From Swiss-Prot:
A lipid is attached at residue 451 (GPI-like-anchor amidated serine). One of its GO terms (molecular function) is glucanosyltransferase activity. (1,3-beta-D-glucosyl)n 2 binds at residues 160, 201. This is 1,3-beta-glucanosyltransferase gel2. GO terms for cellular component: fungal-type cell wall; plasma membrane; side of membrane. The lineage of its organism: Eukaryota, Fungi, Dikarya, Ascomycota, Pezizomycotina. Keywords: Cell membrane, Disulfide bond, Glycoprotein, GPI-anchor, Lipoprotein, Membrane, Signal, Transferase. Residues 420-451 are annotated as: Disordered. It is a lipid-anchor; GPI-anchor. Its EC number is 2.4.1.-. Residues 452-475 form a propeptide.
Amino acid sequence: MLPTYVRLFTAVCALATTASAVVPIEVKGKDFVNSKTGDRFQILGVDYQPGGSSGFTKDKDPLSDPDACLRDAALMQRLGVNTIRIYNLSPSLNHDECASIFNAAGIYMILDVNSPLYGGYLDRTDPESTYNDVYFKQVFGVIEAFKNFPNTLAFFAGNEVINEQSVKNVPTYVRAIQRDMKDYIAKNLDRSIPVGYSAADIRPILMDTLNYFMCADDANSQSDFFGLNSYSWCGNSSYTKSGYDVLTKDFADASIPVFFSEYGCNEVQPRYFSEVQALYGQEMTQSFSGGLVYEYTQEENDYGLVQINDNGTVTLLVDYDNLMAQYSKLDMSRIQASNTTQTSAKPPKCESSLITNSTFTDSFDLPKRPSKVQTMIDKGLSDANTGKLVEVKNTDIKQKIYNANGEEITGIKLSILASGESNTPGAHSSGSTSGSSSSGGSSSSSSDKESAAGTISVPFVGLLSAASFMAFFML
């Protein structure tokens, strides 16, 4: 019979497959922070919508195919990202395996609650007609589906709803949706999950949009964060030529986290992603909390980092390699350092004087909540398909992976991270091409290894590293 300490150590290792790889992220002032360590969290991410909006149906979404999720999570882990954004989700589908896979990979999820299907979005030309209980079954359904995953970072209440085609009162409806989502979360969730808005880069109204959603009111309808879809840096531009210096100045006084919810101009190809060094540099990190590159998969609009082939195999494009190279240059210790000045930022009070453009509403009178929506909030969604964290049993991907030259890359697999650890560039770079040397596993710096030793959640002994746990029972 095996000694007790060996059996217990084996049990701890088994638990590692279901242990929470990440800890929830919170908003403090203008920063995202790790809820356990207090370290600042900077988004290094990609937008993830394989097939685009046309590939989404009520029976299939980006987080409903575990084999595809395992493949993509391993490739994203290798790339160095710590966050993905998903635009369209079907609440009725089972997302447990996919969400758990990304959790194990140390990758957070920012989720849009809308869908392009009938009843799943706010009509920007007639918002009153779609602000109803049918719409909120979609919204609250997404919240229910992902509320139990520690890697659910945030929810987007809207994406570019305010544009040239929208009517003037649309912002009041978006704030009302945020109010309703935050009330549902407060009433029906065990933790607070941030809610925010993703804006188009329309410069004449950009600061009005920020101020409108950032300011505080009695209804608790303000955004917890602000996303910006911006493509002003093209090719080997610069901090000043791209206008990034202007954006940095404009958002310097923001009281909530601001990040690029989309970036990566494709006018010059392949993309160099030289803006990564500016975005995570000394100047911009005072105003921005990182960003999400548009986008992971190659679609008709030609923004992809990878090409998913018809047989499920994947070809890594030059853009993938270029982005990975840019990520590898980042000083993560500086990027993640906490700043008490930023975490203590307070929002302004909502007043009409915050709005300067006459085309943008200065009214903060929100539409009344429909009675059926109030019932959903009070009692919870009656037919909720509530998700749960599950064991990640397999880390080997089934599909073949090819580099930009068409050579097969072997040995790519998912690394299940230690409890409390999120993915960082260069820490999990599995895979090698024929004739090249590679361990096929993960490589870490000394500081990464210290972090990876981490802790494993063991219900009856608290938080102990696996090595410490074994050593304890060897005494």
